[in-house]
């Protein structure tokens, strides 16, 4: 992993491996050097109070998060909310407050950014609230929320989308001090 990739970790939670959210994430990864994790390629089980799911991939991702200075969560907007993959992933952060407090504490002061991608220009009010409150609870810095959209996975097929994604890239670079 390069120094930039260690600084930025981009985590994608989408049902479509070749979807619009993945397209935005790949564009940003290419432009910023961010490491990219696609939750659809991993096995991450639901949170359970008995912690029977410790053999899945969640803790590997959690360790990578502790190595990053900036964590970017990218999710499509499904039914006015984050994807099921992203919600399951966030629910598992509860493990970082119980059985792996050592990892959870290492997230303090890291920057957390949310990217959403949908088929309209703005998602509903309050879309970012769960991520903002998660950042607060984990003592992380919520560093921004950006929404964009794509048509047929073409970042530059639409002038408005191009402007939005370029603004997002510039904002991410500003957040990481590039």
Locations of the language-model features?
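Short glycine-rich catalytic loops that host catalytic nucleophiles or stabilize transition states
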Residues: 38-41, 146-150
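Short, glycine/serine-rich, charged loops/turns that create anion-binding
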Residues: 15-16, 119-120, 150
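Short, glycine-/small-residue-rich phosphate/pyrophosphate-handling segment
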Residues: 106-145
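Short, charged/polar "capping" segments at the starts of alpha-helices
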Residues: 123-124, 153-156
